[in-house]
Regions:
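Generic protein-terminus/edge-of-domain signal
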Residues: 1-63, 74, 82, 109, ...
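Solvent-exposed, amphipathic alpha-helical segments
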Residues: 49, 120-135, 175-186, 230, ...
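Short hydrophobic/aromatic patch on the recognition helix
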Residues: 65, 206-207, 211, 255-256, ...
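Ligand-binding loop in jelly-roll beta-barrel domains
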Residues: 73-97
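Short, Lys/Arg-enriched, Trp-marked, Pro/Gly-tolerant hinge/linker segments that flank
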Residues: 108-119, 134-146, 152-200, 213-225
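Terminal helix-turn-helix DNA-binding modules in bacterial transcription factors
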Residues: 181, 190, 194, 212-257, ...
Length: 274
């Protein structure tokens, strides 16, 4: 008689679909990355030195061992700090799993063992990308599998670690947060610099100066990127272009098309087709 076994189905809370970039680089003391927004996850980890980073309205002062998550469609940038030439580990990846929601807006401080482990995962991801670029499909399939599984295991382990609380290090960072929060609340309509300055109790010149301290975009350009992030969300939920255009306060679908292409580089149809 065959013995009966009970099969316990496993659930994949985290599934890495693809690795997009993997960087291990020492940046110069005057390094300044102007910022970007994309529809996939990114992890920035300081291996040595210090760096400043923004993530939407939040400003972070990152030290050795700090690991910061950037969620999809989050505007973020990074630059050298405290006169150091920071060594940065960066991995960007696409994940199809509800478990990644846990890491939204999270900051961790890695001990030496975890920092070394993340550096090894970064190296594995870089090796996979190199094999892909060389056209070595056989070895790439194995190496990419190892890199993805390694990153998944690291994230599962990280979930058991205590996160590092966010805190604002300067008055200007708090004002920047206030400005961005106002722009996010106004994502369904147009705004002006004058209106935003009044709402934040600032002069127009002070508003622009403080905003430029933490973001390479102008106030209105940044507001448009917020609207496009909302547009991506609404279109992904199945709303039509005309419905999204109206909900976000655009005067016409034609203007919405222009704004969307300016922000993403492609039309709404091509964006979701890709």
């Amino acid at each position: 008689m065959l013995q009966k076994f009970e099969f316990h189905k496993t659930e994949r809370k985290i599934f890495i679909k693809s690795v997009i970039t993997a960087i291990d680089a020492v940046r110069p003391k005057d390094f300044y990355f102007p910022g970007e927004m994309h529809n996939f996850w990114e992890i920035v980890c300081v291996a040595e030195g210090a760096a400043m980073a923004t993530a939407d309205e939040r400003v972070y002062n990152l030290k050795k061992g700090n690991l910061l998550f950037h969620k999809p469609m989050e505007f973020h940038r990074v630059w050298s700090a405290e006169g150091t030439a920071p060594r940065l580990f960066i991995i960007s990846f696409e994940a199809e799993s509800d478990g990644m929601a846990y890491f939204r807006d999270r900051l961790f401080t890695l001990n030496d063992l975890l920092l070394e482990e993340f550096g090894g995962i970064n190296a594995a991801c870089r090796r996979a990308i190199e094999l892909f670029d060389k056209g070595d499909t056989s070895e790439y399939s194995w190496q990419s599998n190892a890199a993805a599984v390694g990153l998944e295991a690291f994230l599962l382990r990280l979930r058991g670690e205590k996160e590092t609380a966010y805190r604002e290090d300067s008055r200007y960072a708090a004002i920047y947060r206030q400005i961005v929060s106002y722009l996010e609340d106004a994502c369904c309509r147009s705004v002006t610099v004058e209106e935003t300055a009044r709402a934040c109790n600032l002069s127009c010149s002070s508003l622009k100066r403080i905003f430029r301290m933490f973001c390479d975009k102008g106030v209105i350009e940044y507001h448009n990127s917020i609207r496009m992030r909302m547009a991506v969300k609404l279109l992904g939920e199945g709303k039509s272009i005309s419905e999204v255009s109206e909900q976000l306060g655009f005067s016409s679908t034609s203007y919405f098309h222009i704004a969307f292409k300016r922000a993403t580089g492609v039309s709404p149809g091509k964006y979701f087709g890709a």
